[in-house]
């Protein structure tokens, strides 16, 4: 398997482009204020729509909403009235990431944009904005991925989501209607629907919606009364991963009458079709320049790494020798080892003073000897650092850095009920979390990463880079949260600072669902944003951790393969190929899985690996906290070689 080119989707026209930027001021007291964008790096939109005239609209990851009135020769930002984010280094507010864009094809001055959880409409090409408020039955936790404006009903707006279906208002948000019952064919189980990735009203019939499904699931037409049908007549590549559906009116030229054009946008191109009858009339290719040389080199270094997790007490002596032999037998070339564990202990002989000051050093690894031996065996070493779950830092200076419990006025924790030796019921704290908003917490972890880099560790892996998800979260409060910051902003700030401080590849571990769907509200993990800073995303697609009702149509073993196959592909799409995808493989049994016999659990493991390879993962990592990799019953080397050969043939086809 060869490393795929890592690309940033940037609009490049066949002429020189220039950007015009506004320069208003920002007030931290008003997080939806005028913002300065002079310092932003992106000058062109990464998603855009034409209107049939020289007027164009776009959205940029960095610059927000953009407008061109001359066909793309010049762009300016119009973000006054749109939300901003306040993240490190806090020099200026930055536009909050926009997730969708729509234009009224009959009145092109009407335009709408969304963030993950908000909707805004402008009647004057973005000069002023008005928020359209979501209310029940629109789900509070929905992640918005698509929006459409009706040309027939000015107050009608449709909104698509990442996993909770499709909704419509016909009165500017006073009431909402759930259209999802029409879309049962998109149901994936356990309350999750396939993503609505693109959306447009039919230009002549306000009862009809055209929508695209994410991840290659096609293009559909929904009628409010008669339901949904899949549309045909389009090239397969036009509907492979639709990110935009737009109508525009094309004027006649004397030889050909006026007609409606439907544009289908994907990451690689925009295909243009005459609408009804459907006929392809052209396409626009999107030029995809590669990342800068340093980023490309980091990804080359991190690509195609097949390995396992090594506990610190297995990182020396006979145990290490046994694991190195096991790796050689199975064609593995990578070790992930805890250098800061789940309790906050530093497991190597650090020279930093602060870990010693907080009582965090429990040296189990002579790091120089360990790295020397690993290099002798040509092993790529990934240093795992558990970031925000950290009992040692939590307890420091009377819990200075702890998440706080606003109800008790004490440090917040995740407590579980248990029985003590006397048979009494007691509550025991299971998890200790520090505040992800505190810059001292970021700096502490980054200093460890820098030390590991200087010692020769090949890659830094940040784990538990999220907010807590268990316990009574309703009482958790974050004392160091700046006004206007959201959970995702704290994590982005940390990653931005870490990226600037480190030269080696950075990887992050993410929940499986956070790589399967666009989401971020519950634990702050937004994979699309993470991929701007890290070289590798490691989804934890453990089949046992997915709800049993999710993808239940497949048998349990085939379900495991599909979770990794589809999940790897979906993660690559969500991250826009900016990060390599290297999933963790479940090399342990949980719950009812423990009843599996040897042949079954061996097959279970191989199905996961097979799915990852078929999804074009850049390697994988076996995870078993006990370090007893009993599910590997036969050498993986030949199995991997065969799988990769099959995948290379598919790629050539």
What are these regions (language model features)?
Residues 298-315, 388-451, 606:
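Active-site-adjacent "subsite" loops/lids of carbohydrate-active enzymes
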Residues 2, 9-13, 17-296:
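Extracellular glycan-interacting surfaces
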Residues 330-364, 636:
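Aromatic-lined carbohydrate-binding/catalytic grooves of carbohydrate-active enzymes
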Residues 535-548, 557-564, 570, 579-647:
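Substrate-binding cleft of secreted/luminal carbohydrate-active enzymes
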Residues 382-386, 461-462, 487-523, 578-588:
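Aromatic-lined carbohydrate-recognition surfaces of secreted/lumenal glycan-active proteins
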Residues 317-319, 326, 330, 430-464, ...:
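An active-site-proximal structural segment forming one wall of the substrate-binding cleft
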Residues 347-358, 390-424, 468-483, 597:
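Aromatic- and acidic-residue-enriched segments that line the glycan-binding/catalytic groove
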Residues 321-344, 455-459, 536, 615-619:
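Catalytic domains of carbohydrate-active enzymes, especially glycoside hydrolases
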């Amino acid at each position: 398997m060869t490393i795929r080119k890592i690309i940033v989707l940037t609009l490049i026209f066949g002429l020189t482009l220039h950007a015009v930027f506004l320069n208003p001021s920002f007030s931290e007291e008003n997080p939806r204020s005028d913002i300065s964008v002079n310092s932003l790096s992106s000058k062109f939109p990464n998603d855009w729509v034409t209107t049939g005239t020289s007027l164009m609209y776009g959205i940029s990851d960095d610059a927000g909403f953009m407008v061109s009135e001359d066909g793309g020769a010049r762009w300016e930002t119009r973000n006054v009235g749109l939300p901003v984010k306040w993240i490190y280094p806090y020099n200026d507010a930055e536009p909050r990431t926009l997730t969708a864009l729509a234009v009224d094809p009959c009145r092109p001055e009407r335009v709408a944009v969304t963030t993950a959880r908000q909707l805004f409409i402008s009647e004057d090409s973005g000069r002023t904005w008005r928020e359209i408020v979501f209310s029940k039955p629109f789900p509070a936790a929905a992640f918005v991925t698509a929006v459409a404006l009706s040309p027939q009903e000015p107050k009608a707006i449709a909104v698509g989501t990442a996993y909770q279906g499709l909704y419509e208002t016909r009165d500017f948000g006073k009431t909402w209607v759930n259209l999802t019952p029409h879309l049962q064919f998109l149901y994936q189980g356990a309350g999750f629907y396939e993503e609505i990735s693109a959306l447009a009203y039919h230009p002549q019939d306000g009862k009809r919606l055209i929508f695209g499904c994410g991840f290659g699931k096609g293009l559909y037409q929904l009628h409010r009364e008669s339901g949904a049908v899949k549309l045909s007549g389009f090239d397969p590549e036009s509907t492979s991963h639709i990110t935009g559906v737009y109508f525009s009116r094309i004027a006649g030229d004397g030889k050909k009458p006026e007609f409606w054009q439907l544009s289908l946008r994907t990451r690689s191109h925009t295909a243009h079709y005459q609408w009804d009858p459907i006929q392809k009339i052209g396409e626009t290719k999107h030029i995809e320049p590669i990342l800068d040389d340093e980023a490309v080199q980091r990804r080359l270094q991190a690509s195609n790494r097949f390995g396992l997790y090594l506990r610190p007490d297995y990182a020396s002596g006979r145990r290490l020798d046994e694991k190195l032999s096991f790796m050689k037998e199975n064609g593995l070339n990578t070790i992930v080892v805890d250098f800061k564990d789940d309790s906050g202990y530093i497991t190597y002989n650090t020279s930093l003073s602060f870990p010693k000051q907080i009582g965090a050093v429990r040296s189990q690894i002579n790091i120089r000897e360990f790295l020397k031996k690993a290099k002798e065996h040509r092993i790529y070493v990934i240093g795992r650092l558990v970031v925000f779950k950290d009992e040692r830092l939590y307890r420091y200076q009377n819990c200075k850095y702890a998440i706080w419990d606003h109800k008790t006025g004490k440090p917040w924790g995740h407590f579980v009920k248990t029985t003590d030796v006397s048979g009494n019921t007691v509550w025991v704290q299971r998890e200790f979390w520090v505040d992800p908003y505190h810059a001292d917490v970021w700096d502490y972890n980054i200093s460890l990463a820098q030390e590991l880099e200087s010692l020769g560790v090949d890659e830094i892996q940040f784990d538990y880079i999220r907010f807590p998800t268990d316990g009574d979260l309703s009482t958790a409060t974050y004392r160091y949260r700046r006004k206007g910051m959201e959970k995702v902003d704290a994590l982005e700030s940390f990653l931005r600072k870490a990226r600037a401080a480190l030269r080696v590849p950075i990887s992050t571990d993410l929940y499986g669902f956070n790589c399967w769907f666009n989401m971020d509200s519950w634990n702050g993990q937004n994979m699309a944003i993470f991929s701007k800073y890290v070289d590798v995303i490691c989804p934890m697609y453990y089949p046992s951790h997915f709800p049993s009702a999710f993808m239940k149509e497949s048998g349990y073993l085939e379900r495991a393969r599909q979770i990794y196959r589809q999940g790897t592909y979906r993660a690559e799409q969500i991250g826009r190929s900016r990060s390599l995808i290297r999933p963790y493989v479940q090399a342990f049994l949980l719950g009812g899985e423990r009843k599996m016999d040897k042949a079954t659990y061996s097959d279970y493991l191989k199905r996961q690996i097979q799915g990852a390879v078929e999804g074009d993962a850049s390697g994988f990592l076996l995870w078993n906290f006990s370090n007893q990799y009993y599910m590997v019953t036969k050498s993986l080397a030949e199995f991997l070689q065969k799988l990769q050969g099959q995948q290379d043939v598919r790629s050539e086809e």
